[in-house]
């Protein structure tokens, strides 16, 4: 019995892993990362070089990447060449430097787009906000990560002072601090990058899972390369490139897996409270969302995404998709703050139009019917909808008690 939740979660995770085409997306991100590697290093070196007292942070960050992230021999070869290219790139003109920065920003924009797809978000941040967030991550991200590495190294060295009396303290610190630091880095990505509210606890769970799988992947890749040195025997030094590409691909697969865990946790934990499937369930949810927006319109306020979800008990991705459909219909729109409002007066929105959009497309019914009988049925259904029709304002008035909303 205790295995059922784990089995259900893994099944749901596998379905979303396949639906989001993670293997193909990881390959695309690996290639994009390879192109943006030198620009990223150039910006990072520029940040560490221009800020006073940052040399130690840069050296600590480089050592951490080599020891905990990059594959051993291939990572050192690639890092050596990339640093040489970055030092040469630092002598570029203003236009060349700008192009490098644009290339690095394009990678971050691609990561944001992929994360939004995983969370089912179709509405991206405004362009200026995206550029600001990406530039912040590009410039201050290495500094924060370098500072974290230095702090981690200090904790490890401090724990080593106790290793003479308690040897296990140093071993535990050396074994746990790198995964925790990686987990914090991944958790920050899952929490900050998607244009969607993410609970910190879910981001931490996804980040720690990704960090553990990442370290296991790194160890496994190292053992594979050491046990099957075919690439090294055939290609020599050039073997670093395919090994590095493989490492990039596996790394992005793990990062995307952690993002999927973070995005899947809310739907899995709330599965008992989700709306049960029934014929017309999407139309019912659309009407309930529009009724909530109509009630809020009378009060002159928007409605948040979480409140609309609670009203309908929809899963996050289903609620996001339904709201996007309402936006595409021109009925609702998202504010700059991320909340939702009606685009016109509630008295001008008829429920018959909503039902025909989300449950019963009578125009398609009539057009696809091969005989006159099908068209007669469509016309009778249309007449029935019109006879029982009411506006959103009338529905909101019924929900909030008589006379609470003015009916137009």
UniProtKB/Swiss-Prot annotation:
Keyword field contains Transmembrane helix: yes
A UniProt-annotated Pfam family: Virul_fac_BrkB
Descriptive protein name: UPF0761 membrane protein azo3165
Family: Belongs to the UPF0761 family.
Disulphide-bonded residues: none
Keyword set, alphabetical order: Cell inner membrane, Cell membrane, Membrane, Transmembrane, Transmembrane helix
Cited PANTHER family: INNER MEMBRANE PROTEIN YHJD, UPF0761 MEMBRANE PROTEIN YIHY
Species of origin: Azoarcus sp. (strain BH72)
Gene3D superfamilies in the cross-refs: Winged helix-like DNA-binding domain superfamily/Winged helix DNA-binding domain
Subcellular location: Cell inner membrane
Keyword Nuclease: no
TM stretches of this protein: 29-49, 92-112, 131-151, 172-192, 197-217, 220-240, 241-261
Membrane topology: Multi-pass membrane protein
UniProt cross-references to InterPro entries, sorted A to Z: UPF0761_bac, Virul_fac_BrkB, WH-like_DNA-bd_sf
Biological classification of the source: Bacteria, Pseudomonadati, Pseudomonadota, Betaproteobacteria, Rhodocyclales
NCBIfam families attached to this UniProt entry: yihY_not_rbn
């Amino acid at each position: 019995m205790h295995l059922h939740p784990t089995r259900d979660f893994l099944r749901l995770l596998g379905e979303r892993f396949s639906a989001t085409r993670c293997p193909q997306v990881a390959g695309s991100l690996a290639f994009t990362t390879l192109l943006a590697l030198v620009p990223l290093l150039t910006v990072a070196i520029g940040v560490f070089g221009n800020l006073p007292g940052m040399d130690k942070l840069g050296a600590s960050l480089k050592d951490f990447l080599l020891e905990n992230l990059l594959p051993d021999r291939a990572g050192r070869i690639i890092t050596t060449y990339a640093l040489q290219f970055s030092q040469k790139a630092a002598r570029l003109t203003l236009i060349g430097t700008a192009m490098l920065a644009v290339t690095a920003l394009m990678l971050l924009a691609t990561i944001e787009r992929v994360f939004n797809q995983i969370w089912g978000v179709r509405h991206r941040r405004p362009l200026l906000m995206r550029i600001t967030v990406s530039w912040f991550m590009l410039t201050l991200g290495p500094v924060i990560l370098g500072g974290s590495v230095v702090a981690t190294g200090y904790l490890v060295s401090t724990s080593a002072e106790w290793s003479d009396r308690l040897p296990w303290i140093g071993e535990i610190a050396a074994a746990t601090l790198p995964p925790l630091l990686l987990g914090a880095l991944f958790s920050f990505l899952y929490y900050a990058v998607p244009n969607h509210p993410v609970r910190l606890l879910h981001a931490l769970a996804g980040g720690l899972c990704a960090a553990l799988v990442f370290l296991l992947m790194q160890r496994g890749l190292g053992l594979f390369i050491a046990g099957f040195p075919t690439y090294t025997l055939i290609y020599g030094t050039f073997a670093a490139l395919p090994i590095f590409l493989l490492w990039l691909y596996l790394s992005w697969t793990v990062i995307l897996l952690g993002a999927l865990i973070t995005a899947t946790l809310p739907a899995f934990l709330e599965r008992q409270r989700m709306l049960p499937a029934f014929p017309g369930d999407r139309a019912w949810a659309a009407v309930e969302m529009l009724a909530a927006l109509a009630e809020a319109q009378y009060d002159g306020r928007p409605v948040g995404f979480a409140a609309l979800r609670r009203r309908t008990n929809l899963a996050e991705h289903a609620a996001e998709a339904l709201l996007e459909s309402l936006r595409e219909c021109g009925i609702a729109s998202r504010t700059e703050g991320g909340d939702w409002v009606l685009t016109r007066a509630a008295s001008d929105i008829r429920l018959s139009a909503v039902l025909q959009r989300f449950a019963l497309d009578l125009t398609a019914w009539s057009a696809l019917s091969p005989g006159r009988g099908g068209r007669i049925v469509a016309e009778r259904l249309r007449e029935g909808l019109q006879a029982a029709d009411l506006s959103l304002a009338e529905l909101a008035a019924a929900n909030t008690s008589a006379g609470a909303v003015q009916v137009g």
